[in-house]
Amino acid sequence: MPVTRRRLLLVVPAALALPTLAPAAALRVPPLALQSWRLPNGLQVYALPDAAAATVSVQVWYRVGAKDDPPGRSGFAHLFEHLMYKGTRHMPAETIDRLTEDVGGQNNAFTVDDVTVYHSEVPANHLEPLLWAEAERMAHLEVDQASLDSERHVVVEEYRERVLADPYGRFFEALPALAFDVHPYRRGVIGRIDDLRAATLDDVRAFHRTYYRPDNAALIVAGGFDVADLARWVQRHFGPVEAPGTPIPRVAVVEPPRRRDEARRLAAPHVPLPAVALVWRAPGAAHRDAAALQVASALLAGGHSSRLHAALVRERHLANAVGFGADLRADAGTLAGWAIAAGGVPPARLLGVLAAETLRLAEKPPSAAELAKVRAQLTTAALVERETPAGRAEALGWALVLRGDAHAADRALDELQAVTAADVQRVAREHLLRARRVALTYVQGAPG
């Protein structure tokens, strides 16, 4: 889940009242109007011009995320995201706010495992100053001890609020660690308090030198602009930024296969009702099964008409809330189903029914109507995202980071619509039924 500088929105979509799409009615969506080039310093530039747009979205995607946190510095990529809003050699702190909010625009940022993204939207005639500001903080960030202490405090309080104070914060934080034994995906994006407190100014400077460089970034600009103007401004402001001669460190950890099923128990204070989870490892976002796993996830928990909600909440009254997610990242992924018990329901019973209903997808494929509805939901969500410049830029960025190809944003829509019931049953058998899993029981008690 993305961690933002100012806010974190976790949206669980309800079932959409949409007409079903028969396979013959598959949509043909025009591809993104993409133009791209690379500067001599390695910066990748992607332009998505739209003559009808009155605004422009500027996004800088740095290929550094929580998986790249230095040893003993969990949460550092996220902490650094906050520090990028401090001053630079030629730009006082809060300048990004003045260049966006003061002209009716907005800005924000988020950090996930594979990437850190800075995104702004302004009226189209304010594009060049924003490009200057992004190049300036890429090249000349300056952070002092007071700024580090201030932003560290913000992030520590974020951890307290989202993980320690939330009755189920520890529960959801534990799921990645259950999926991975050695890959840094097992760490939380926000980090641990002791690691955050250990960060130093030297750490900050080294991190910026190592990862915040033109050859580790993609600049995506979408909206109302002329491509020739954009190319001239990008060269003017980003062209002089030098790329270090040192290589960029990359995570090369290969997760060993899980040999057996495991069961874990986690206790935490102030847990009003027990919760359970089942966690499997999954392939990465570029895998051929990614679209089918996305469809399978939506069939299981995509709103109130989904299989898990119907079986555990509406019909049997075993759970107050359920979910299932296919979190497919660049290197690998996880599949996780979870449920929060209804009053008086033993965790063991809830876990058994959760497992049975999840694995039933491998035995009973979706009906034509069920599959068409889910495909319509997912396709509609993707099309709604593309209605704005910011949404089109973000779709392109995710394709670039997770699949290594910006054009995969277009193929993804066709791949979703091509998923069949047999595909869903096949991936459920391969990645759920035949795969090893970890079962978690979460209860009230003293933390271990």
What are these regions, as identified by a protein language model?
Residues 86-90, 121-152, 303-304, 327-385:
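M16/insulysin-pitrilysin zinc metalloprotease superfamily fold
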Residues 23-66, 90-126, 162-216, 240-287, ...:
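Non-catalytic beta-strand/loop surface segments
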Residues 74-88:
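Active-site SXXK
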Residues 1-15:
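N-terminal secretory signal peptides and thylakoid transit peptides that target proteins
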Residues 66-72:
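Short pre-active-site segment immediately N-terminal to the catalytic Zn-binding motif
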